[in-house]
């Protein structure tokens, strides 16, 4: 069987801009980009708010089938207009934008045919959980801001009803989440049943008004906000729970693989291409790549076990790591302090590895309580455009959050991982707006995993256990290639996936369960990490070999990050251009 090739064949289209640069082509391209964003913001007010566009802050998106069809028709028009523009007449930077826009819109169309909107949630998030964060993105600063925010709260029942109607359509079509993972979602939905407005995160802007809002308006706005949550938000969550428990769970499918859905094999094949950003990637190739990486990393892990002089089998060593109290924080504050300390230690090394650093800061916060039980160990939240980023650390079930993986988690989610990457992208100048938040998963998650590896060179790992933790995180991502394709393409059961992760990683039993349920609910996404990291490592080795003593690690990293989020084929061409300078 063929292992997925890490080298990507260079496209026949020249990377450099054509000497026959056309201002008309550039004008047409910029107009197309502007019209696409304007349409997207109008159709998705939450994205508009996050992008700093406040024209639609008083409403939530429409997600009806008619709205979905409107999006498809618009994307077909956008793609047709793009293909009519002579790419060869563009500058090198505009060619990057052209290629990324092509990927973004064509992939939206490829996935739209599978009508994913019929299942608008996964194991740890979804429409019901996402809206509970909208107060942070909205961040109202004036009386008018608050009034628009209140109107958006009052629109929530309509938004929930449309999503419920879409889920009912999925039930009729056999396009549902698997019944086997719904218990965890049920716990999240139960935690979203608020007894009074003050218990709801969406009330927080009314608890503390900024000084920019006149004090004379505070009481009126607080009363209106409380009323909106009491009359609109709380009943909407109650109706959703009733629907989820009484209708959805009893009728959810009893298979777990995406390939078991109607049209599922074509659907999963499209997801593999989308999440890897590789047009020729196949599930079988990805699976074989995963098996090869698991074997390689296992040998490195076993070498550390021997170095420690542990008397026992590999499985017994994993049990020791999962159960010995020395490896776990005693309080949430201890875990958060450890994470914050690691971020500052990394900060001291950043100038030696990166020439360009972002202006935007980030903070360390616990995962919100209502999400934590079914959430991953940590995640990065970029926040609203212009605001600080957030490194979320999960403080739920501390005996399942080993400290020996905390350096890897921090490198991945904060710096030099997602915060560095995302903040630099948002600070790009003279690029179309869509690129500021563009996130091709293989590049984004591949960079996060590469950052964990870079931590070795930065001196972040101080003990053999932390080195083992780094390897277990890498092994975890290699296992994802095997497990995700196993369940969604090769017919694996959930138990097979659980057993495979338990046998090969030092993740806690709780983390293994939440991870497998995430892969089941979000098919294909787990492939992005290792495929992207392998490409970045391969490109670095290529640059080191080609440049020899002229290789500069800071310049290489800047070249990788200077265009924000890119597909792996675009990244390869950019690194080839870096080598040729």
State where each predicted segment sits.
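N-terminal maturation segment of proteins
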Residues: 21-581
């Amino acid at each position: 069987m063929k292992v997925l090739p890490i080298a990507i064949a260079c496209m026949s289209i020249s990377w450099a801009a054509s000497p026959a640069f056309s201002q008309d082509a550039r004008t047409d391209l910029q107009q197309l980009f502007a019209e696409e964003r304007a349409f997207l913001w109008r159709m998705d007010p939450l994205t508009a708010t996050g992008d700093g566009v406040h024209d639609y802050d008083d409403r939530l998106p429409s997600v009806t089938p008619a709205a979905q069809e409107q999006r498809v028709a618009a994307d077909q028009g956008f793609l047709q207009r793009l293909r009519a523009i002579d790419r060869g007449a563009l500058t090198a930077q505009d060619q990057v934008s052209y290629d990324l826009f092509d990927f973004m819109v064509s992939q939206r169309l490829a996935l739209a045919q599978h009508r994913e909107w019929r299942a608008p949630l996964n194991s740890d998030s979804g429409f019901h959980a996402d809206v509970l964060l909208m107060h942070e993105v909205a961040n109202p600063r004036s009386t008018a801001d608050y009034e628009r925010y209140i109107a958006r709260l009052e629109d929530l029942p309509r938004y929930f009803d449309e999503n419920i109607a879409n889920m009912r359509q999925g039930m009729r079509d056999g396009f549902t989440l698997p019944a086997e993972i719904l218990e965890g979602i049920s716990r999240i939905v139960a935690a979203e049943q608020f007894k009074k407005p003050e218990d709801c995160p969406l009330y927080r802007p009314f608890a503390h008004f900024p000084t920019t809002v006149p004090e004379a308006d505070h009481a009126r706005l607080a009363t209106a906000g409380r009323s909106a949550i009491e009359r609109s938000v709380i009943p909407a969550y109650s109706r959703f729970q009733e629907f989820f428990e009484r209708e959805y769970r009893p009728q959810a499918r009893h298979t777990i693989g995406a390939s078991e859905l109607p049209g599922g094999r074509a659907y999963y094949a499209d997801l593999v291409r989308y999440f890897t950003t590789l047009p020729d990637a196949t599930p079988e190739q990805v699976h074989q790549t995963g098996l090869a990486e698991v074997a390689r990393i296992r040998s490195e892990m076993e070498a550390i076990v021997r170095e420690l002089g542990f008397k026992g089998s590999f499985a017994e060593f994993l049990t020791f790591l999962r159960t010995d109290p020395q490896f776990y924080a005693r309080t949430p504050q201890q875990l958060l302090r450890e994470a914050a300390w690691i971020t500052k230690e990394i900060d001291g090394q950043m100038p030696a590895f990166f020439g360009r650093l972002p202006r935007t800061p980030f903070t360390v916060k616990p995962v919100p309580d209502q999400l934590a039980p079914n959430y991953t160990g940590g995640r990065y939240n970029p926040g609203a455009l212009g605001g600080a980023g957030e490194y979320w650390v999960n403080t739920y079930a501390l005996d399942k959050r080993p400290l020996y993986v905390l350096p890897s988690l921090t490198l991945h989610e904060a710096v030099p991982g997602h915060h560095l990457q995302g903040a630099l992208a948002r600070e790009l100048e003279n690029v179309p707006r869509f690129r500021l938040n563009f996130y091709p998963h293989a590049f984004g998650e591949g960079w996060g995993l590469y950052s964990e590896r870079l931590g070795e060179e930065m001196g972040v790992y101080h003990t053999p256990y932390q080195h083992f933790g780094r390897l277990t995180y890498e092994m975890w991502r290699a296992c994802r290639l095997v497990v995700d394709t196993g369940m969604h393409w090769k017919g694996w059961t959930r138990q097979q996936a659980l057993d495979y992760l338990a046998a090969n990683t030092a993740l806690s039993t709780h983390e293994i369960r939440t991870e497998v349920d995430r892969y089941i609910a979000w098919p294909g996404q787990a492939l992005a990490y290792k495929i992207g990291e392998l490409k970045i490592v391969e490109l670095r080795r290529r640059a080191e070999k080609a440049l020899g003593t002229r290789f500069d690690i800071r310049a290489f990293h800047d070249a990788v990050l200077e265009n924000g989020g890119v597909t792996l084929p675009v990244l390869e061409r950019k690194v080839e251009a870096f080598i040729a300078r």
